[in-house]
Amino acid sequence: MSSRYLAAVDDYLHHPSPRYQAHVDLRRELRAYADEERREAARAIAHPERPLLPPPATQAAPPQPSTREAAHPSAPTAASS
């Protein structure tokens, strides 16, 4: 290999192009952003001691459907006979 080629490669490795450096910087920033998102998600995971949502309000008894609403549509009822 020519010494000029080796000198050019050596120069490139020691002084990367602005485009390559921008690529490296962007990847570093994206990794930092992803790490921060992972940390925030880990903090947001619910623990039994501190749930994300308050417990649902309890009702005395859930409403029961009437016999007419509970009957299957194809089943004959006293009113339809």
Swiss-Prot record:
Subunit structure: Interacts with host TAP1 and TAP2; these interactions inhibit the loading of peptides onto MHC class I molecules.
Keyword Metal-binding (UniProt): no
Ranges annotated as biased composition (Low complexity): 72-81
Region spans: Active domain: 3-36
The name this protein goes by in its record: ICP47 protein
Keywords: Early protein, Host cytoplasm, Host nucleus, Host-virus interaction, Inhibition of host adaptive immune response by virus, Inhibition of host TAP by virus, Viral immunoevasion
Family recorded in the similarity comment: Belongs to the herpesviridae US12 family.
Pfam family, one: Herpes_US12
Compartment(s) of residence: Host cytoplasm; Host nucleus
GO biological process: symbiont-mediated suppression of host antigen processing and presentation
Free-text note on domains in this protein's UniProt record: The N-terminal active domain blocks peptide binding to and peptide transport by TAP.
Keyword check for Chaperone: no
Listed InterPro entries: Herpes_ICP47
Region (Disordered): 37-81
Pro residues: compositionally biased ranges: 51-65
Main location as per UniProt: host cell
Cellular component aspect of the GO annotation: host cell cytoplasm; host cell nucleus
Function of the protein: Plays a role in the inhibition of host immune response. Binds specifically to transporters associated with antigen processing (TAP), thereby blocking peptide-binding and translocation by TAP as well as subsequent loading of peptides onto MHC class I molecules. Empty MHC I molecules are retained in the endoplasmic reticulum and ultimately directed to proteasomal degradation. In consequence, infected cells are masked for immune recognition by cytotoxic T-lymphocytes.
Listed Basic and acidic residues bias regions: 37-50
